[in-house]
Amino acid sequence: MNREIDSAREQIDAAWLRSDADGITRHLAEDAVLLPPNGAKQVGREEINTWLRGLFQHYTMTELAMPERELTVSGDFAFERSLYEWLLVPNGEGEAIRDRANWVGIWRRAANGTWSEICGIWNSALPADVSQAKAETAEAAGSS
């Protein structure tokens, strides 16, 4: 493992639990890319910060665990693969979202030796709700 990246990951995870977009994005490169599931890519630290602030207006993460994590460093790049478990609770009406998610993060070491995350992507490790998908597909087919 890499102490600097490990420390940054701990700080990022703690920031998620505080709904702290700045605490998350301070560890990202200026040109970072975030690829959330079922949504548009977010490009650049500022755009990612805005996306996170929007998320935190609606949800608060109250549980976060990482039962699996692997980090491979190769030269000035590091590749992180993790399994996350989290609970997002709505700040108003609605249902909480519990998920297990596969995460891949790519880190880059700058000329001054500091590491920043340059790309992150995740997807749910839970099975898709096939009955809901079938109902939505049937509804869409009927409305064509």
Language-model features and meaning:
Residues 1-26, 33-144:
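A beta-strand edge to alpha-helix "cap/lid" segment located at domain peripheries
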